[in-house]
């Protein structure tokens, strides 16, 4: 990492240079917007400036060029500093950024919790008798496959709507207020679930609650990636997966308690719904005091607020902190400016498919997240129901679910350690490979009806959960934040998550048909199907998923711009701040050529 004292000294030298001509009135210092207008008017991208030994005092126009040069140099220094920053230094420098990111991501606990209890309700006796029907052949009570599919479709449809509403809401009021509004609506919609007396009311409640969940899915990832440096990006984006698991673990514990103590009481399903009121208010208060994303503020031209936001994420004080703030703001400006020059329009959903570069980035982001569904993870969400249909007792099914989520949490922590030695693609691909093997073994055990094979298939589903949370589950949250451009990040993540939701709907329907005794009744033999689909996802990853570990946002932008193939991303080195073979330009305000600038035509 560049020595910070070097950056401070260079800044001090620049400050002293501004006082060389004490008799001259202080000239107007151009803002970034003015500098950007100047370069656009000339159709130039200033890269390098040279002053001859006998140069006169710079004019205002030439100071514009000098300021642009300094901003680009600052951006380069900040980018190099971020790329080489050790984890310990990042934690010491950005502890508040990490804390704010953890707070925002905690909203996902509620989604993981509620989606898990919905699947567990299907195995809860009181819920089965209250809302289900009796199987004439087996005499067992269960929720019909059509209603299970309907309830799943409702909350996923709500998430799709919520995600689409998140885009314009963020453009209008920012990340913080969008999250606060979503938390308010979630608390209100939970009343419908608590007072439900029919599956229809549950369907309405799930659909309405799905809208704020969709908001959480998008903004937790984008906020974490924008507020934290590269060294912390993997840990804080993948923390989203931990929040999902914490929510699912809480749900499994609550449902086991309901199955044990309230098996014949309406509290068995009302109490789990009521517990959703615990988090919205404290989270909303915390997020109200959180800093807004500096990337969002810079895109809105609110540079002073972006600096204040960055100051609130950094530790320390004095000149070192101010220089870090200035360098980071300059880097964000340069990155966004380079993206804006590709199009004059404000970022929209259509821009995600506008050209070959953005189409590729959008495709990879969408398929990357869809891989979480096609790898068989939806089966993990219905684990309690799966265990029961595989022949495991109801009480043991809930116990298996708790063990499964604990293994998932351990696996996610292990992925943090593994990320230091393996890349994003490595974890994604290796996780898929292991899951494929285990699914085929589960399918084979499903062909036997012995007690040992039933317990074996249940145990191996826990192995699937472990490898899933070691590989594809956490790394996806990091990858989807790195693939899009900063200008289109929120909208691309929304499209990707909605792709996941649509694919999840299809996978959920298939799983419910595979497990329901009135439909296909495959049981553990469904492992064969998910093994094949998981293998297909692995093939896509090998062909199309690039390695972004150790790459800053501006480097990733350049690699996509150059059309580097997926498997060469890791080995290709780029310098986004250098333009080669540039023609010469002499300023109109300096006809003698005292100031020479190397430029590149747009």
From Swiss-Prot:
Keyword annotations from UniProtKB, A to Z: Cell membrane, Maltose metabolism, Membrane, Sugar transport, Transmembrane, Transmembrane helix, Transport
GO BP, sorted A to Z: maltose metabolic process
Under what conditions is it induced? Answer: By maltose and maltotriose. Repressed by glucose.
Q: Which GO terms describe its cellular component?
A: plasma membrane
Side Extracellular, residues: 128-142, 200, 256-270, 385-397, 448-459, 514-525
Where does the UniProt annotation locate this protein? Cell membrane
This protein's record includes keyword Iron-sulfur: no
* Family matches, as NCBIfam families: SP (TIGR00879)
- Spell out the protein name for this chain: Alpha-glucosides permease MPH3
- What gene, per UniProt, encodes this protein? MPH3
């Amino acid at each position: 990492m560049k020595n910070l004292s070097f950056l401070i000294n260079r800044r001090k030298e620049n400050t002293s240079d501004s006082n060389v001509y004490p008799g001259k009135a202080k000239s107007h210092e151009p803002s970034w917007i003015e500098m950007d207008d100047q370069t656009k008017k000339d159709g130039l991208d200033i890269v390098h400036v040279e002053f001859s030994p006998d140069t006169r005092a710079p004019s205002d126009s030439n100071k514009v060029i000098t300021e642009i040069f300094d901003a680009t140099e600052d951006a380069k220094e900040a980018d190099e500093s971020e790329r080489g920053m050790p984890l310990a230094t990042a934690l010491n420098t950005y502890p508040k950024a990490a804390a704010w990111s953890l707070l925002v991501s905690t909203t996902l606990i509620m989604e993981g919790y509620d989606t898990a209890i919905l699947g567990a309700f299907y195995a809860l006796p009181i819920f089965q008798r209250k809302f289900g029907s009796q199987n004439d052949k087996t005499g067992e009570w269960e929720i019909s496959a059509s209603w299970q599919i309907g309830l799943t479709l409702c909350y996923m449809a709500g998430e799709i709507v919520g995600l689409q509403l998140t885009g314009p809401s963020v453009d209008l009021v920012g990340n913080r207020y969008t999250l606060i509004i979503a938390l308010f609506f979630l608390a209100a919609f939970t009343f419908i679930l608590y007072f439900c007396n029919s599956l229809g009311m549950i369907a309405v409640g799930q659909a309405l609650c799905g809208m704020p969940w969709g908001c959480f899915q998008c903004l937790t990832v984008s906020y974490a990636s924008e507020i934290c440096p590269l060294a912390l990006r993997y840990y804080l984006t993948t923390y989203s997966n931990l929040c999902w698991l914490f929510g699912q673990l809480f749900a499994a514990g609550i449902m086991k308690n309901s199955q044990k103590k309230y098996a014949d009481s309406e509290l068995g399903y009302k109490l789990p719904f009521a517990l959703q009121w615990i988090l919205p208010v404290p989270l909303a208060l915390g997020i109200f005091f959180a800093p807004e994303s500096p990337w969002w503020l810079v895109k809105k031209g609110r540079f002073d607020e972006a600096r204040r936001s960055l100051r609130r994420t950094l530790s320390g004080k004095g000149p070192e902190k101010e220089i870090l703030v200035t360098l980071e703001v300059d880097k964000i400006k340069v990155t966004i400016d380079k993206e804006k020059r590709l199009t004059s329009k404000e970022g929209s959903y259509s821009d995600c498919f506008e050209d070959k570069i953005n189409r590729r980035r959008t495709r990879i982001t969408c398929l990357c997240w869809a891989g979480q569904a096609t790898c068989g993870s939806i089966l993990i969400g219905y684990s309690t129901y799966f265990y029961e249909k595989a022949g495991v007792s109801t009480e043991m099914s809930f116990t298996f679910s708790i063990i499964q989520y604990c293994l998932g949490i351990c696996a996610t922590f292990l992925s943090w350690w593994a990320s230091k030695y393996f890349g994003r693609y490595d974890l994604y691909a290796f996780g898929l490979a292991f899951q494929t093997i285990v699914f085929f073994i589960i399918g084979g055990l499903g062909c036997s009806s012995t007690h040992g094979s039933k317990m074996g298939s249940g145990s191996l589903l826990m192995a699937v959960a472990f490898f899933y949370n070691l590989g594809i589950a956490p790394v996806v949250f990091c990858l989807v934040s790195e693939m899009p451009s900063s200008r289109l990040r929120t909208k691309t993540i929304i499209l990707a998550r909605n792709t996941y939701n649509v694919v999840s709907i299809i996978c959920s329907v298939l799983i419910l048909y595979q497990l329901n005794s009135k439909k296909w009744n495959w049981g553990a033999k469904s492992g064969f199907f998910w093994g094949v689909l998981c293998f297909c996802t692995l093939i896509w990853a090998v062909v199309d998923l690039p390695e972004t570990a150790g790459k800053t946002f501006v480097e990733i932008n350049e690699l996509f711009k150059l059309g580097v193939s997926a498997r060469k991303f890791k080995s290709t080195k780029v310098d986004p701040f250098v333009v080669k073979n540039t023609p010469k330009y002499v300023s109109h305000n300096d006809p003698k050529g005292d100031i020479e600038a190397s430029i590149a035509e747009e």
